[in-house]
Regions:
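Alpha-helical transmembrane segments and immediately membrane-proximal extracytoplasmic
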Residues: 1-218
Length: 218
């Protein structure tokens, strides 16, 4: 139909060395931890809503007021919507504010668990991309590459889908940074443990041993 797929060319890709590999691994550990925090935040906000705002209409109205107030205080609409603008800026320009990923996490949880419809996947992408961009800048690593790798690493951490994350990275970013994407995805997958966005997801085999566990995610 003549529709081109979305791609984000990553131009600043350093050669893989022990130093760059370790920096990528450190960022990936951060993505795994952030994956856990995101899952816990979503669950906790949902529980608080259910406890203190049992009426769904009041809950939605109160949540809307809180979200609008936070947006006015922050003086930006960057955290509204799925977060595609944050993703593009982080990967294409290597730009992200230090707290972008935290505000996006909070506002996503407040919105989704209040009852507004949408998905967590693209917001998870934007959280990962902005975190990676900031972490890359701190570590003296390519912010663009760190944003791309962290985007799929955090996605893997919250969904427990490493193969899907790998294929998404190749489709969106190409194969030039494949080694970094694989490092980030594998480490985030291990660090994130058995947390997930999906409460009914089942992990059949242990992430750490060749053992059948057949357990539900947290």
């Amino acid at each position: 139909m003549g529709i081109d797929p979305e791609t984000f060319p990553v131009h600043s890709i350093p050669g893989l060395t022990v130093g760059t590999g370790l920096k990528m691994a450190l960022i990936a550990v951060g993505c795994g931890i952030l994956s856990i925090l995101f899952c816990i935040l979503l669950k906790t906000v949902g529980q608080l809503y259910a406890k203190y705002l049992k009426n769904p209409y009041i809950r939605i109205a109160v949540a809307a007021g809180v979200i609008i107030l936070i947006t006015i205080c922050l003086n930006t609409k960057d955290y509204m919507g799925a977060g595609s603008g944050l993703i593009a800026r982080a990967i294409e320009k290597g730009e992200a504010r230090p707290l972008d990923f935290l505000w996006k996490m909070l506002l996503t949880a407040l919105t989704m668990r209040a009852g507004y419809r949408g998905g967590e996947i693209v917001p998870a992408f934007s959280i990962g991309a902005t975190f990676g961009c900031v972490a890359g800048g701190i570590l003296g690593f390519s912010p663009e590459l760190a944003a791309a790798a962290s985007m799929v690493a955090l996605f893997c951490g919250v969904t427990n889908c490493p193969i899907t994350a790998m294929l998404i990275s190749f489709e969106l970013f190409g194969f030039s940074g494949a080694a970094y994407y694989l490092i980030a995805i594998s480490i985030s997958y291990a660090v994130s443990g058995y947390y997930s966005l999906y409460k009914d997801q089942t992990i059949v085999y242990s992430k750490y041993k060749a053992r059948y566990i057949n357990r539900k995610t947290r």
